[in-house]
């Protein structure tokens, strides 16, 4: 697990970047710093690429740093990190403003969240006046939950108070403590909520519209000036992605190790999450269009943003051709 650091504030990113300097000098590997927002199966491709040596095969020494989504976006734009995994957060920022960044790969085509409450909440309608905890305001977890609450007949802006609740495991603890009343949990945490704590699950975002939650986003400057570097990163992640699809047991072992859960929980997490992942690091044109149209409605935009403003899958397509990924 060398190279994985969990940090809470942006200043710690710089500390994490410096940790591997000695190893870098000894092994002649080029550093890549990638952020991710929450401990869950959604970032499994990063765990696999790290654990199974795919980053090193590309001559990369990966520091994978946990920070809140909006902090990751700020760090990307300032050049403190090379890439971010939580593309949903930066997509929402790009839909509303002009940011010099591009989403270059897409690993998830559906959100991986299950709405969870204590057992006394019989339906989502009972949450009126209650508190929902999320990782990032305006991020994938937040907006996916908003859509499900709307379907249940609530007006989230008026009926629900939204607070920052930490990452998914922290949200479970807040839910158990009564600090929040609703959490949107990903595997394996949702399995622990169901089996260990007997909490109530109200529905899944897997049944919702396409939602491009995780992938890889880089600055336009990095993509323009260091395209080969970006390609090496995508090649490592694509090998990890292929490993995910072809090796259930190995993927579950990686999850169990990184997320500190028992192997049966990791196996169920894999099987629950598998349908949400793309086959080749690409979202289809239809999935992108549906996603942007739904986002425009939730964000109250006049019209959907053009896909070309946000996505550039050209390097991922080159990698897919090289690796024979369909």
Give the location of each predicted region.
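Solvent-exposed, polar/charged alpha-helical surfaces in well-ordered, non-transmembrane soluble domains
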Residues: 52-53, 74, 78, 102, ...
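Short, glycine-/small- and polar/acidic-enriched structural segments
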Residues: 26-167, 174-177, 181-187, 199-204, ...
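Pocket-lining segment of extracytoplasmic ligand-binding domains
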Residues: 88-89, 168-259
């Amino acid at each position: 697990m060398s190279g994985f650091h969990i940090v809470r504030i942006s200043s710690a990113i710089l500390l994490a970047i410096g940790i591997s300097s000695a190893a870098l000098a000894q092994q002649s590997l080029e550093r890549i710093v990638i952020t991710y927002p929450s401990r869950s199966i959604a970032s499994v491709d990063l765990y696999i690429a790290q654990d199974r040596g795919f980053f090193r095969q590309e001559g990369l020494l990966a520091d994978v740093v946990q920070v809140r989504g909006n902090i990751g976006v700020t760090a990307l734009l300032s050049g403190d990190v090379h890439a971010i995994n939580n593309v949903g957060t930066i997509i929402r920022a790009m839909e509303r403003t002009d940011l010099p960044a591009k989403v270059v790969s897409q690993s998830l085509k559906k959100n991986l969240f299950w709405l969870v409450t204590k057992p006394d909440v019989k339906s989502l309608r009972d949450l009126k006046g209650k508190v929902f905890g999320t990782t990032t305001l305006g991020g994938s977890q937040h907006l996916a939950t908003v859509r499900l609450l709307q379907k249940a007949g609530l007006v989230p802006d008026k009926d629900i108070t939204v607070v920052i609740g930490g990452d998914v495991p922290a949200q479970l603890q807040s839910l158990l403590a009564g600090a929040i009343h609703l959490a949107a949990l990903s595997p394996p945490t949702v399995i622990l909520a169901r089996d260990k704590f007997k909490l109530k699950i109200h529905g899944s975002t897997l049944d919702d519209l396409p939602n491009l939650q995780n992938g890889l986003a880089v600055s336009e400057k990095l993509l323009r000036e260091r395209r080969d570097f970006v390609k090496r990163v995508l090649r490592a992640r694509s090998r990890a992605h292929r490993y995910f699809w072809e090796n259930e047991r190995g993927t579950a072992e990686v999850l169990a190790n990184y997320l500190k859960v028992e192997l049966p929980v990791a196996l169920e997490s894999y099987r629950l999450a598998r349908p949400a992942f793309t086959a080749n690091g690409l979202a289809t044109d239809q999935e992108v269009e549906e996603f942007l149209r739904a986002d425009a409605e939730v964000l109250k935009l006049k019209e959907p943003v053009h896909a070309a403003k946000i996505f550039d899958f050209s390097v991922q397509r080159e990698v897919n051709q090289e690796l024979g990924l369909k």
